[in-house]
């Protein structure tokens, strides 16, 4: 969700932080965000291998994934950075399927089940990010645009997740409230 939000606010964020001369980097940041949105799922699936004592599988997967990661770099050498970044997005999806395939055998939680469980969160996140991105089309100062996008995104996220009562949201909310009460 955060990576999609970052992709949605990339243009005003880059202009504010490093200036208009860096506008060509907006698309690069957005592509990198798409590549990184699966990172939590990668981490969980790899942690399962470690917890279950399958460092052998972990090592094999890392070797395979690093080998696959060479291809986007080669693409980048010949076709440019944007193609390389899109290659890294593809590599991220391939790596997720590899990681989840092997962890699924260990915990009886298939890739399809994982996707089915995270699909509602991704759907809501994509929708909210799309609404946030629409604000980047307005011809207003980036100093108004960025805070507006962030406020709209946070408000929508809170309202939609409160309404849908998704288990993932409820768990994050419970943990957040618990941390606040400890202080």
Name these PLM-found stretches:
Residues 4, 27-73, 77-105, 149-154:
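Short runs within selected transmembrane alpha-helices of multi-pass transporters and secretion channels
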Residues 51-61, 111-119, 142-143:
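Short, amphipathic, aromatic/basic-enriched membrane-interface segments that mark the entry/exit
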Residues 104, 109-111, 118, 131-183:
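Membrane-proximal transmembrane or re-entrant/amphipathic helices at the cytosolic face
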Residues 11-15, 43, 47, 166-170:
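Short helix-terminus and kink motifs of transmembrane alpha helices
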Residues 9-14, 18-22, 53-54, 76-81, ...:
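Short helix-capping/hinge motifs at transmembrane helix termini and TM-loop junctions
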Residues 15, 94, 101-106, 114-118:
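A generic structured-segment signal
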Residues 1-39, 70-71, 75, 126-129, ...:
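Alpha-helical transmembrane segments of multi-pass membrane transport and lipid-handling proteins
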Residues 64-68, 118-133:
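Hydrophobic membrane-spanning alpha-helices of multi-pass integral membrane proteins
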């Amino acid at each position: 969700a955060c990576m999609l939000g970052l992709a949605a606010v990339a243009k005003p964020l880059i202009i504010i932080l490093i200036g208009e001369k860096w506008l060509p980097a907006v698309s690069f940041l957005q592509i990198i965000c798409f590549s990184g949105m699966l990172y939590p799922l990668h981490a969980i699936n790899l942690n399962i291998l470690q917890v279950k004592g399958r460092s052998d599988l972990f090592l094999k997967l890392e070797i395979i994934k690093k080998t696959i990661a060479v291809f986007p770099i080669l693409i980048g050498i010949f076709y440019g950075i944007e193609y390389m970044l899109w290659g890294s997005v593809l590599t991220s999806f391939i790596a997720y399927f590899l990681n989840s395939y092997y962890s699924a055998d260990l915990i009886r939680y298939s890739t399809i089940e994982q996707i089915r469980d995270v699909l509602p969160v991704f759907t809501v996140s994509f929708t909210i990010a799309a609404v946030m991105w629409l604000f980047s089309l307005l011809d207003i100062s980036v100093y108004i645009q960025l805070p507006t996008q962030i406020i709209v995104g946070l408000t929508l996220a809170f309202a939609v997740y409160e309404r849908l009562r998704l288990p993932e949201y409820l768990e994050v909310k419970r943990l957040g409230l618990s941390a606040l009460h400890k202080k």
